[in-house]
From Swiss-Prot:
It is found in: Secreted. Its cofactor is Zn(2+). Expressed by the venom gland. InterPro entries: MetalloPept_cat_dom_sf (IPR024079), Peptidase_M12B (IPR001590), Peptidase_M12B_N (IPR002870), Reprolysin_adamalysin (IPR034027). One of its GO terms (cellular component) is extracellular region. Ca(2+) binds at D284, C390, N393. It comes from Protobothrops mucrosquamatus. This is Zinc metalloproteinase/disintegrin. Binds 1 zinc ion per subunit. GO terms for molecular function: metal ion binding; metalloendopeptidase activity; toxin activity. The lineage of its organism: Eukaryota, Metazoa, Chordata, Craniata, Vertebrata.
Amino acid sequence: MIEVLLVTICLAVFPYQGSSIILESGNVNDYEVVYPRKVSALPKGAVQPKYEDTMQYELKENGEPVVLHLEKNKGLFSEDYSETHYSPDGREITTYPSVEDHCYYHGRIHNDADSTASISACDGLKGYFKLQGQTYLIEPLKLPDSEAHAVFKYENIEKEDEAPKMCGVTQNWESDESIKKASQLYLTPEQQRFPQRYVKLAIVVDYRMYIKYNRDSNKITVRVHEMVNHVNEMYKPLNVAITLSLLRIWSTRDLITVQSDSKVTLGSFGDWRKTVLLKQQSHDCAHLLTDITFTKNVIGVAYKKGMCDPKLSVGLVQDYSSNVFVVAAIMTHELGHNLGMEHDEDENGKKCKCDTCIMSPAISDPPAQLFSDCSKNDYHTFLTNSKPQCILNAPLRTDTVSTPVSGNEPL
């Protein structure tokens, strides 16, 4: 039986509540302050695990109590998850950290069936939740001897006036290489009855991004974990589990030429993945996180229908926003292309017109969290026609994929 931890968050007036403040997510011009206070349901004197499997948080929104129910995302890491960086002389240094007792959660708001939440509890509470159609973010205020957190709407993050950020995939663009279909094996009745798919994702961080975060590998690692936790949450409605298989940080130099032409860089990364990375550790798809500025306002690109192909199961994502939620939305979009999804609206304005869906060609504001019906149909067509075999394999841990939590479930 899983013990439940109840935490009451008390709202309080902060001296500069409502004024602008600089947070990790950016400059925020309107926010509320909350003070988390734990009220444990465990018996007095019982030993509490560092991070409980199930937690509840209660806060007040417009004077009404809101109950946030969270469950640990046990599917976040693969059993063989590894982290690699490089010594000054270029030697690979690989570790296999213990990640079973991690601090990343998904959840729902009680009595709000359309709600979602993706939260890190590693150092305070950080992440987002969707309540009554509105996206809120929460993160700790870095104050000495204080448990204060800021809660704010995404729309209250100050943004620069700039051209729309675009995906580099166009309607007619395809790789010069055909995608091999040799892995179209027979599906067992069990696989047909249980259509869950599992993507073991490899994340590679380029040298520019390493410099951007002041050569702090730990900070980058936490950011990537938060990012993939968000991506995993957004793929749940499609019954796709995104599992982080490996994290590699190019901490001395880039191992390919990362240039502003996104499609050239994507091709180079695909070659490197096929000839180097795939031979070192098993995974299904690899994405390169970079701090380079691509031409034509491109912030991401991936091969359409490339999933499971040795060279084409790759994508590029620019770490262009300090808000990890925004970058996670870009990664979710590019993974959609890997899984056979087209843009919701093509160059002729046809197909699904959905400016607030994940596969819109331009990133929406706030970033979309839902796939359109067209995207779901594209994905199902890809599964039927291409039969990507690699994503049929469930992770080895028996507790990897947890049951989604309904917003209407009794707590």
